[in-house]
Amino acid sequence: MKIGLFFGSFNPIHVGHLIIGNTMAETTDLDEVWYVVSPQNPFKKNQSLLHEFDRFDMVTAAIANNPKFRASDIEFSLPKPSYTVDTLTYISDKYPQHSFVLIIGEDNLDQFTNWKNHEQILHHYSLYVYPRPDSSNSFLREHKNVRLVAAPLLEISATYIRNLVKQEKSIRYLVSKEVEELILSRKYYSNY
C-alpha cells in the first residue's frame, strides 16, 4: 500500500486537517492517510500543547468513520524532540510492505531546508504538498519528488479554536462533532 503520512500536533485536529487528508486520499494515488500525532514539534513552543494521548484521542474520534484514515501514535515511543527523518526511517523499517509519502503544507516546504536531514528525506520519499496561505514559491517545488496537490486553501487555525474554547464560544463547524464533544466534556483548552 501507498500511505501518506500527515504529521501534526493536531492541537486540536480540525476540519481543515480532515479536508486535506480526504483530498489526498481521494485525488492522489494514496491508499491511506495516517495522521501521525507528534508529541513535540521541534519548531513550535510547547505552552498550550495538550498531552499527546489526549490529542491522539481527538484524532481517533475525528477519523473513526473514514476507512482510508488511520491515527498513529508511533512517535510517542521515539526520542524527543521528534524529527521527521527519524520517524520516517523507523516507520519504513517497521512496515517494509508499504511505501510512504510525506504530506506537508506549502508553508513547510518553504522551511524544508531547515529540517534535520532534509536531503535524505527528499532522496527517499516523495512530498505531497497542499497549498497554504502566505507561502512563497520555494525552489523545491520543481524537485522531482515534490508533487503539488490541488486542495482547498483553508485558513483555520488550531490557535483560533483554542482561543474560542477559552472564551467559551462555539467551535461548531470548525471541528468534528466528536472532537467538539471531547473538548467540552474533558474541558480541554479552558484554562490554557
Swiss-Prot record:
EC class name: transferase
Pathway: Cofactor biosynthesis; NAD(+) biosynthesis; deamido-NAD(+) from nicotinate D-ribonucleotide: step 1/1
Keywords: ATP-binding, NAD, Nucleotide-binding, Nucleotidyltransferase, Pyridine nucleotide biosynthesis, Transferase
Any one GO molecular-function label of the UniProt entry: nicotinate-nucleotide adenylyltransferase activity
Gene3D superfamilies (UniProt xref): HUPs
Gene Ontology biological process terms, A to Z: NAD biosynthetic process
EC number annotated for this UniProt entry: 2.7.7.18
Keyword Cell division: no
Pfam families registered for this protein in UniProt: CTP_transf_like (PF01467)
Protein family (similarity comment): Belongs to the NadD family.
NCBIfam families, per the entry: cyt_tran_rel, nicotinate (nicotinamide) nucleotide adenylyltransferase, PRK00071.1-3
Role played: Catalyzes the reversible adenylation of nicotinate mononucleotide (NaMN) to nicotinic acid adenine dinucleotide (NaAD).
Protein name: Probable nicotinate-nucleotide adenylyltransferase
The encoding gene: nadD
